C-alpha cells in the first residue's frame, strides 16, 4: 500500500513539474509559471504555488521556455521605434490587453472631419495620427480612448 501511495504521489508531482514554464519579459525579468494558453493577445498562466489564473499581454513577453524539454518559444519581438516614420510598428490594443505593460502618458490630437468624408476614412486617419504621435514619443502601444472629431485621445504604453 505504501508503494502504491508513493508511486501515485511521484506521478502527480512529476506531472506538475513537467508543466512548469519560464516566462522571460522584454525587460529581462524571468517568472516561473504554469502555462495554460494564449488567446486574444493574452498569455494565461498560474503561479506554481497557486491555482489562481492570471494573464499578461503577449506583447510584454519575449519568450516562453518549457523547463522539462528546454524548448524555447518566442512569443513576441521587442518593438523599437526610431521616430515618427515608424508609426506602422505602433500597435493599437484594447484596455484588457495591456496587463504587464506600463502606461507612459496620454496623447491628444486634433483632426477635423471634412465635408463628404466617410466615417471609416476619418477613423483610419485618426488612428494614423495617434500612431504617429506615439511613435514620435517612443511608445510602441496605444489604447484609443476617444476618436471623435476635434478630440482624439489615446493612452500610450511601453515595456515595464
Identify the residue ranges that each predicted region occupies:
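Bacterial Sec-dependent N-terminal signal peptides
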Residues: 1-22
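Compositionally biased alpha-helical segments
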Residues: 19-141, 145-149, 155-160
Amino acid at each position: 500500500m505504501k508503494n502504491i501511495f508513493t508511486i501515485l504521489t511521484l506521478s502527480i508531482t512529476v506531472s506538475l513539474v513537467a508543466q512548469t514554464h519560464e516566462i522571460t519579459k522584454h525587460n529581462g525579468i524571468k517568472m516561473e509559471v504554469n502555462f495554460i494558453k494564449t488567446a486574444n493577445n493574452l498569455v494565461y498562466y498560474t503561479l506554481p504555488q497557486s491555482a489562481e489564473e492570471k494573464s499578461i499581454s503577449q506583447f510584454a513577453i519575449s519568450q516562453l521556455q518549457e523547463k522539462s524539454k528546454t524548448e524555447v518559444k518566442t512569443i513576441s519581438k521587442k518593438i523599437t521605434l526610431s521616430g515618427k516614420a515608424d508609426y506602422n510598428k505602433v500597435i493599437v490594443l484594447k484596455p484588457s490587453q495591456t496587463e504587464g505593460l506600463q502606461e507612459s502618458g496620454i496623447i491628444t490630437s486634433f483632426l477635423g472631419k471634412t465635408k463628404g468624408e466617410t466615417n471609416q476614412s476619418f477613423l483610419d486617419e485618426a488612428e494614423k495620427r495617434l500612431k504617429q504621435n506615439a511613435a514620435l514619443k517612443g511608445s510602441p502601444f496605444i489604447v484609443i480612448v476617444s476618436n471623435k472629431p476635434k478630440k482624439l485621445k489615446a493612452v500610450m504604453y511601453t515595456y515595464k
